[in-house]
Amino acid sequence: MALSTATKAATDALAANRAPTSVNAQEVHRWLQSFNWDFKNNRTKYATKYKMANETKEQFKLIAKEYARMEAVKDERQFGSLQDALTRLNAGVRVHPKWNETMKVVSNFLEVGEYNAIAATGMLWDSAQAAEQKNGYLAQVLDEIRHTHQCAYVNYYFAKNGQDPAGHNDARRTRTIGPLWKGMKRVFSDGFISGDAVECSLNLQLVGEACFTNPLIVAVTEWAAANGDEITPTVFLSIETDELRHMANGYQTVVSIANDPASAKYLNTDLNNAFWTQQKYFTPVLGMLFEYGSKFKVEPWVKTWNRWVYEDWGGIWIGRLGKYGVESPRSLKDAKQDAYWAHHDLYLLAYALWPTGFFRLALPDQEEMEWFEANYPGWYDHYGKIYEEWRARGCEDPSSGFIPLMWFIENNHPIYIDRVSQVPFCPSLAKGASTLRVHEYNGQMHTFSDQWGERMWLAEPERYECQNIFEQYEGRELSEVIAELHGLRSDGKTLIAQPHVRGDKLWTLDDIKRLNCVFKNPVKAFN
């Protein structure tokens, strides 16, 4: 039987390039490259407007054996600590209740990002032409599989060994109720796997990992430790050990297209869009989770953001890519303004919509209010007084018949959803830089909170057609939606979400039903 072309090529290459007698990993890596050949045509299923060079190198030069050995050691350390020492020390119940709720969101939402990163890096493997570059992407595919399991394990560990397991144990089902879910899908799903393959690399590797890994995965371990959580640092620092290779993959993606004429034409616009897509969600959500989802504070979110995003990434990291024509995103200045107030604006809305969550929220106490005012002068007059009014009206007590969403309606502060980012905003109450912009397309009204998202939508309106929470549930009563989407604890009547983290005065489905709260689409006022 005649040999296939591929088999013959491999046989001839092996005959010409004998296997190394050494077990040195770098020598083996060099030997493996001799099996490469030039493609007449790139047969990828995933189109890109850029041409990725065929000679691009991989910085870390991993081979499968070395990769497996390295990751096995890390997993032994991680799971050994979790299943032995931390369990014996009853670490799960020593976590502050507010932080326990924060991890319901962080670990579950990050799991979605890691899961989609599997597909994203697999797509890049298929699109790349250089064998070394493919090898780097393939190692990242394996990393992302590992990280998906790790994030899921954090929820599992808290559900089994921690306090208040509701939300940890079924977050994949209950997370879809509230407005934070679709915004998360926009950055962690659509941004990573939809559209041009190189654009996906910019979203995932150059922005998501190189820019936001430090303020997310590294910073979260500091906040976790400060609030009694030893589980999260054990897992997330293990995840972080892989991230440098992922950043290098993003760097090499840019290197591979540097000489392509399309790079000069499209790259900086695509990078700006990727950065704004990621920061529009991460900047307010991470700041909200860290500062409002903790009892013991580390440092103001704005300082963390400035250090890692503005200075380290926007200045140093992007500066290193300057020789390839890469420029800092034009939207970086506006993002810096968002870092100061946007997370405070978002928490007002998150607390107002607390029944739609899969986690418990809590109003800032007096000590926390003083911390906010000291680090964000003017915070109390704008936000603190509102929280005090809500507390005085009994927002934590189900017998009060009051949820803060009613306050927004009473005071004519409509809540909108940004069509591109899917992040809620209230322009009449925002202290950050949110301005209401409205467009009509195909008979549907679309709202936007900033010029950058508006520009992306105007360029590709068909790309942003996802229904928001008010469109999806318009005309439906709130308790009906909560029950349908499994927002109840195991007793079948008590809500998973609560407006406090205590064990008493828990809201039930009947309490919500008595409010007769019906979803309305605020854009109907423009018709």
UniProtKB/Swiss-Prot annotation:
Binds 2 iron ions. GO terms for biological process: one-carbon metabolic process. Keywords: Iron, Metal-binding, Monooxygenase, NADP, One-carbon metabolism, Oxidoreductase. Fe cation 1 binds at residues 114, 144, 147. Its cofactor is Fe cation. CDD domains: AAMH_A (cd01057). One of its GO terms (molecular function) is metal ion binding. It catalyses: methane + NADH + O2 + H(+) = methanol + NAD(+) + H2O; methane + NADPH + O2 + H(+) = methanol + NADP(+) + H2O. Pfam families: Phenol_Hydrox (PF02332). The active site is at 151. Its EC number is 1.14.13.25. Fe cation 2 binds at residues 209, 243, 246. Responsible for the initial oxygenation of methane to methanol in methanotrophs. It also catalyzes the monohydroxylation of a variety of unactivated alkenes, alicyclic, aromatic and heterocyclic compounds. M.capsulatus has two forms of methane monooxygenase, a soluble and a membrane-bound type. The soluble type consists of four components (A to D): protein A, comprising three chains, in an alpha-2, beta-2, gamma-2 configuration, is a nonheme iron protein containing an unusual mu-hydroxo bridge structure at its active site and interacts with both oxygen and methane. Belongs to the TmoA/XamoA family. This is Methane monooxygenase component A alpha chain. The gene is mmoX.
